[in-house]
From Swiss-Prot:
Residues annotated as transmembrane: 7-27, 36-56, 83-103, 108-128, 134-154, 163-183, 207-227, 229-249, 265-285
Name this polypeptide is given: Protoheme IX farnesyltransferase 2
Protein source organism: Pseudomonas aeruginosa (strain ATCC 15692 / DSM 22644 / CIP 104116 / JCM 14847 / LMG 12228 / 1C / PRS 101 / PAO1)
Known catalytic reactions: heme b + (2E,6E)-farnesyl diphosphate + H2O = Fe(II)-heme o + diphosphate
Alphabetical list of InterPro entries matching this protein: Protohaem_IX_farnesylTrfase, UbiA_prenyltransferase, UbiA_prenylTrfase_CS, UbiA_sf
Gene Ontology cellular-component annotations: plasma membrane
Entry EC no(s): 2.5.1.141
Protein family according to the UniProt entry: Belongs to the UbiA prenyltransferase family. Protoheme IX farnesyltransferase subfamily.
Length: 296
């Protein structure tokens, strides 16, 4: 039972979601040439770093978590794990994760993981989440790091492919997070967290959601146009983007914003999972000229 508490405080659901993303970035860069030890080190190392960030986030959020129905049962709120023990747990996970990334990948990969960690723990959790409606935007930078870390573990450089992944996953985070904020609106209001639906209302948030999905759609095409992914990926990217946009647009005449937001959230998981899988397997592209060049 005690082991389960230490597992739960690390938010295993978030870790699993990031595993899919980091694998997508890794396989995209590897293009069929997989080094098993590098893959394992990247996946395990980043998982430990993410787990560490989640534990420290739980420690920081103890005061606001007790006001939210979704989070008031967390072990850091109920006292099932002491603050001292949770902090030690988080720090050990972080040291192990960064140590493994430094030892088995490359300095750039470790630095990118460190940047994401700093943004999530230092900027988002400690400051922006509590004080600004732009906290979601700041947090999206850390949420977009896993696929970039996976990609750069192979490539060793931050190129256009890495930049495309950063844009795709940053832009995806916004509608995904806003959907959560809408169907959990009362929780955020009770905790005094100024997410966009609380600060400016659901109507304004719906506009932002549509605009971010349009930007996400454009960003997903960059991997194919730049020669990093193939036509299968392109087909899936267009399909999931259009379907996600269609769901977003139904929000303008929905009778129940919470039901609509849950649908939007659920499909966001489908969309990003589908893209991660496709970029993992559809790396066969035309040589050098790339699709964008072949159009002229």
């Amino acid at each position: 039972m005690k082991l389960k508490r230490y597992l739960l405080v690390a938010k295993p659901g978030i870790i699993f979601g990031n595993l899919i993303a980091v694998a997508g970035g890794y396989f995209l860069a590897a293009r069929g040439s997989v080094e098993p030890m590098l893959l394992l080190a990247t996946v395990i190392g980043l998982s430990l770093v993410v787990a560490s960030g989640c534990v420290l986030n739980n420690c920081i959020d103890r005061d606001i978590d007790r006001h939210m129905e979704r989070t008031r049962g967390r072990v850091t709120v109920t006292g099932q794990i002491s603050l001292k023990a949770a902090l030690a747990h988080g720090l050990v996970l972080g040291v192990a994760g960064f140590g493994l990334l430094w030892w088995r990948t490359n300095p750039l990969t470790t630095a990118l993981a460190g940047f994401g960690y700093f943004v999530y723990v230092g900027l988002y959790s400690l400051w922006f989440k509590r004080r600004s409606q732009y906290g979601t935007l700041v947090g999206s930078l850390s949420g977009a790091m896993p696929p970039v870390v996976g990609y750069c573990a192979v490539s060793g450089q931050f190129d256009a492919g890495a930049a495309s992944l950063l844009a795709i996953f940053c832009l995806w985070q916004m509608p995904h997070s806003y959907a959560i904020a809408i169907f959990r609106l009362k929780d955020y209001e009770a905790a005094g967290i100024p997410v966009l639906p609380v600060a400016r209302g659901i109507a304004v948030t719906k506009i932002h959601i549509v605009l971010y999905i349009l930007a996400f759609m454009a960003a997903t095409l960059a991997l194919c146009l730049g020669g990093y992914a193939g036509y299968g990926y392109l087909l899936v990217a267009v399909a999931v983007s259009l379907w996600w946009l269609a769901i977003a647009l139904t929000g303008y005449w929905t009778a129940d914003d919470r039901v609509w937001a849950r649908k939007l959230f659920a499909f966001s998981i489908v969309a990003i999972t589908a893209l991660s899988v496709m970029m993992s397997i559809d790396f066969q592209v035309a040589p050098a000229t790339h699709l964008v060049a072949s159009l002229f």
